[in-house]
């Protein structure tokens, strides 16, 4: 190398400096219950726990906006946390327009296929506690636990009986026994944590050394206070927090904007580098990674 050819950097070049650069990491919207729709960086679409607000047993008010099924677009992947009706009932509506991979626990995969007429070829049955590689993300599965409904297992499926479709009752009977949480690692290395139900010890243990996911979806229990929710999220770890299953409320926490504000105040008071965001139903949002110049 001829060192005489090296010149110093020109700090004031003719080409102006950039003031900002942005990478769109993820698009998402909340639909109902634990149903979120994600558009991944490569354009593929992931849907969690398909249950739309127009379903017969949905917790809705007179002014609750319903989803336009035509607006869903092509769904590539569906994940199912557990098999209660409010996590799977909208599957037939999706299969009228798409042919997604349905990722669910192998324990109830047969009943899911039978109850909703899903071809076995479309179902990817997993074993809890394992890792899986899909074309568009890596998936880690964690054993979860449903909240206590104080019920015993109904072998005949009478608790959720459907006179026109007997398989639905039996499918629902698995719902409180088999519950799975997830970590999605996108091809960009962005991570989405899905934490529903109770008894999250194995999930917390797995995530504690990595600081938790970039985006945490955490179930807001029906009677949960902002303090309880904030402290549970802190124990899980993560950066951005989105609520799920907050369609079911009690009078004290029906204002989710106030709930979110109170949770963030607790995060700030605890000096926790975590923030909660309450998405408006059906509205699209974008998570960006960006660099921007500080104001002078």
Predicted regions and their residues:
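Beta-strand-turn-beta hairpins that frame and shape the catalytic cleft
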Residues: 21-27, 39-46, 131-140, 185-192, ...
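Pre-active-site segment of Zn-dependent metallo-hydrolases
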Residues: 12-20, 37-80, 89-96, 148-173, ...
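Active-site-proximal loop/helix segments of hydrolase catalytic cores
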Residues: 167-236
């Amino acid at each position: 190398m001829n060192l005489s050819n090296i010149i110093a950097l020109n700090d004031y070049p003719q080409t102006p400096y950039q003031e900002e650069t942005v990478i769109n990491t993820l698009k998402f919207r909340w639909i109902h219950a634990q149903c979120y729709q994600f558009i991944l960086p490569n354009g593929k679409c992931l849907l969690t726990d398909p249950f739309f607000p127009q379903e017969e047993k949905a917790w809705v008010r007179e002014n609750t906006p319903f989803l336009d099924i035509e607006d869903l677009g092509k769904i590539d992947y569906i994940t199912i946390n557990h098999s209660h009706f409010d996590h799977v009932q909208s599957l037939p509506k999706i299969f009228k327009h798409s042919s997604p991979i349905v990722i669910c626990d192998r324990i109830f995969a047969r009943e899911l296929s039978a109850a909703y007429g899903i071809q076995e070829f479309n179902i990817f049955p997993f074993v809890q506690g394992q890792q899986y590689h899909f074309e568009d993300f890596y998936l880690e599965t964690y054993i979860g636990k449903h909240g206590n409904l104080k019920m015993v297992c109904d072998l005949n499926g009478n608790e959720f009986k459907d006179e026109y479709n007997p398989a639905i009752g039996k499918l629902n009977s698995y719902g409180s026994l088999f519950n799975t949480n997830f970590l999605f690692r996108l091809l960009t290395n962005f991570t989405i944590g899905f934490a529903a139900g109770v008894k999250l010890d194995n999930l917390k243990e797995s995530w504690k050394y990595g600081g938790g996911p970039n985006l945490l979806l955490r179930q807001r229990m029906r009677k949960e206070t902002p303090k309880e929710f904030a402290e549970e999220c802190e124990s899980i770890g993560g950066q951005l927090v989105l609520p799920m299953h907050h369609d079911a409320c009690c009078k004290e926490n029906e204002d989710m904007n106030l709930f979110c504000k109170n949770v963030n105040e607790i995060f700030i008071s605890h000096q926790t580098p975590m923030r909660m965001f309450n998405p408006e139903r059906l509205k699209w949002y974008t998570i960006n990674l960006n660099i921007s110049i500080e104001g002078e």
